[in-house]
């Protein structure tokens, strides 16, 4: 991205990944911050998911220091405030407050993190000139990304089977917690952590699986 003019960039969150390259989470965050400190144009915009704690606050501070246009989204957001989220059978209902108006959105995606990603994406559209009402209205037309809480099949007993790319502790936790509100019976998890790049995440993922799923099957 260093050779490209970037009008707007977004920060969602930071979780354990790529530590085989960066060494620790602090170095990883420093590398991510270069997007906002060096790559975004001086007259550009930054969209921040405001609910990621210290990391969100640090990106917000940097955007203000550089004088960039700042849009914040989420429950603590001021540009797009997530006032309410209600999970349904095939998606979720969102109530968004923006520009003094309340918008009711039927989002055909499962999980809190997918609502977060959708709002951050909407923020990027708005930051680059999109109309707020039109942008939020179009969220109801989104389609799930393959391999991201993708419903693969429904078994003969009526149980839906979902496939997700989750390969970090945070991602696994988010996927299970996203599915739990839609689960009427047992939640059965099949997962693995192959390869030798970051073996330190395996016990964390195992603990999350044991705590949040009803049955766990570990693959090799």
Please state what every model-predicted region is.
Residues 1:
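Conserved helix/coil segment N-terminal to the catalytic DExD/H
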Residues 5-161:
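Acidic, Mg2+-coordinating active-site environments of NTP-dependent enzymes
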Residues 21-26, 166, 193-197:
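Short, flexible loop segments at the rims of nucleotide/cofactor-binding pockets, characterized by
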Residues 114-117, 134, 167, 171, ...:
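Generic hydrophobic secondary-structure packing signal
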Residues 144-147, 170-173, 177-220:
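Active-site beta-alpha connecting loops in nucleotide-dependent enzymes
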Residues 161-167:
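Switch II (G3) loop of P-loop NTPases
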